[in-house]
Amino acid sequence: MEWFEALILGVLQGLTEYLPVSSSGHLAIGSALFGIQGEDNLTFTIAVHVATVLSTLVILWKEIGWIFRGLFKFEMNAETKYVINILVSMIPIGIVGVFFKDYVEEIFGSGLLIVGCMLLLTALLLAFSYYAKPRLKENISMKDAFIIGLAQACAVMPGLSRSGTTIATGLLLGDNKAKLAQFSFLMVIPPILGEALLDGMKIVKGAAAGTSDISVLSLVVGFLAAFISGCVACKWMINIVKKGKLIYFAIYCAIAGAVTIACTLM
């Protein structure tokens, strides 16, 4: 992987991790265009995912600080309930990671046709949430957190946007727009770090076998590109959800999905 390829893919990851257009789908398309695969692709994916987690921590540091201050009061307050909701939302993705990880990895290697189909499904979800009748829930309930977690578990499919799926699900449930976007970005931090740890163990084994030769420069460039673009996209996406402008991303996903399918079948 050349440094300029890492730059492009890093920016792509940073933007699409938060914008509801599927980071996994766009990374798969970008990697296919650049001919990047195997251990190099896995190493780079870990680096840019960790970068976007860091960008979440930077943009939402006030909310994270609020959570930890409340936790250390050691009482059942709003902050403790928030953490419980995040833990509840992790149950479905945890089950998928433990029992279906190999199956999911097979799907990721099945080509771009599935990516195109899932992009179309993302478009439908965003469109449904846009036209859904708005309801006013002040806080995300434990039940809603679990349902949103189910949506996140489904979004392991390449091309099905995690942020788009979770936010659209929350909107259909009638949750508060601003709080929903923040919850969606915070709930994914533990699963991403857990997956990065597991994949990192694979990289260590691969390095011992000499199966990865991606340069340090490419990793650093990709990491910084993903972090900076992720900071911009995270803040932007929160404002987009507040203003209810997801329909534009539904149109984009529909076009991107259709083009991907057409190119795959040609």
From Swiss-Prot:
Superkingdom field: Bacteria
Catalytic activity: di-trans,octa-cis-undecaprenyl diphosphate + H2O = di-trans,octa-cis-undecaprenyl phosphate + phosphate + H(+)
Membrane-spanning residues: 41-61, 80-100, 107-127, 140-160, 180-200, 214-234, 246-266
InterPro entries, per the entry: UppP
Keywords on record: Antibiotic resistance, Cell inner membrane, Cell membrane, Cell shape, Cell wall biogenesis/degradation, Hydrolase, Membrane, Peptidoglycan synthesis, Transmembrane, Transmembrane helix
Keyword Cell wall biogenesis/degradation assigned: yes
Class of enzymatic activity (EC top level): hydrolase
Residue stretches in coiled coil: none
Entry keyword DNA repair: no
Family matches, as Pfam families: BacA
Membrane topology: Multi-pass membrane protein
Disulfide bonds: none
Sample GO molecular function, one term: undecaprenyl-diphosphatase activity
EC number from the UniProt entry: 3.6.1.27
One Gene Ontology biological process: peptidoglycan biosynthetic process
Main location: membrane
One term under GO cellular component: plasma membrane
Subcellular location: Cell inner membrane
Its job: Catalyzes the dephosphorylation of undecaprenyl diphosphate (UPP). Confers resistance to bacitracin.
Other remarks in the entry: Bacitracin is thought to be involved in the inhibition of peptidoglycan synthesis by sequestering undecaprenyl diphosphate, thereby reducing the pool of lipid carrier available.
Family, per entry: Belongs to the UppP family.
Name the record gives this protein: Undecaprenyl-diphosphatase
Organism per entry: Phocaeicola vulgatus (strain ATCC 8482 / DSM 1447 / JCM 5826 / CCUG 4940 / NBRC 14291 / NCTC 11154) (Bacteroides vulgatus)
Lineage: Bacteria, Pseudomonadati, Bacteroidota, Bacteroidia, Bacteroidales
Gene name per UniProt: uppP
